[in-house]
Amino acid sequence: MNKKNALLMAYDKAGIADFARGLISLGYAVYGSKGTVEHLAKDGVQAIDIAGIVGEPILGHRVVSLSREISAGILARDVEEDRAELTKHGITWFDLVCVDFYPLAKELADPAHTKDSVIEKTDIGGTTAVRAAAKAGRVVICEPVDRE
């Protein structure tokens, strides 16, 4: 696996295009969630939509990146056995995960928040990807300021 792969899932899109350009200049292939890929495309940055790996988002966009394929690509160990299993199943290895979370604290601070609005701002897929990346010793970026 010569080319490195980065998974970008950004709620806050500020600076994500420049970050992706930097990764590409370092030899990374950039993968992303649909919204991130669409934003990058508008800025002229080519990225691969993970929907091609996991299918289109479902349940009102609640399930986007939660999948065996994404988790395995992040959690696989850098050993021949795991790499062979990824290859066998056509799963992409991810070297870097860049996720910023939905603004849950901001939503909770809004006096007009509702149970449903809080539920919608509770990030599951991003949290799962970040925890998997941390467990696997991958590069993890969670704050937009760290993309600069």
What is each PLM-predicted segment?
Residues 27-32, 52-54, 69-71, 118-122:
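Short, surface-exposed linear patches
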Residues 10-17, 30, 34, 68, ...:
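Electropositive phosphate-/nucleotide-binding environments in soluble metabolic enzymes
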Residues 1-50:
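N-terminal glycine-/serine-/threonine-rich phosphate-binding loop
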Residues 35-104:
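Glycine-rich nucleotide/cofactor/substrate-binding loop typically near the N-terminus or early
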